[in-house]
Design a protein with these regions (language model features):
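Charge-dense, helix-prone N-terminal extensions
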Residues: 1-133
Length: 133
């Protein structure tokens, strides 16, 4: 899947920003000071099944995580370096390919991640973001 499509979708949300986490080489996406996504290539020596994969980590509903893991066991993994109960890592190279999630689904998961994180911001922060967008 073309990463520019992912970036465009992630940054289309009100108040969304991105910043490179230089020491890790990860692109991290934020809203209201909270991370809602990150895109990166896992180190070649990372533990399996993450090693060397191009991943997109997203916040996700726990029930939806179980469904996605059952449907795409090799393409949707427990969140890398995050709580696997509430985060997933999608193999970007498998999105839109046979056996992997569709590009549309991957983009919908980006939207869900934003909504989940935005909903946990204070009401004041939500208003400020809405007013400046």
């Amino acid at each position: 899947m073309d990463v520019s499509l992912i970036e465009k979708r992630l940054l289309s949300h009100p108040g969304a920003t991105k910043a490179l986490h230089e020491s890790w080489g990860w692109m991290v996406y934020w809203v209201g000071g909270k991370q809602f996504a990150c895109e990166f290539i896992a180190a070649p020596d990372a533990k399996p099944p993450y090693a060397g994969r191009h991943l997109l980590s997203l916040k996700c509903d726990p029930d939806r995580i179980r469904e996605l893991r059952a449907e795409f066991p090799d393409a949707v993994l427990p969140g890398y370096y995050s709580d696997g109960r509430t985060w997933i890592s999608v193999d970007v190279d498998q999105a839109g390919m046979p056996g992997g999630p569709s590009e549309e689904l991957a983009l919908d998961l980006c939207d869900m991640s934003y909504r989940l994180v935005f909903s946990k911001l204070t009401k004041r922060m939500q208003r400020e973001i809405a007013e400046t967008s």
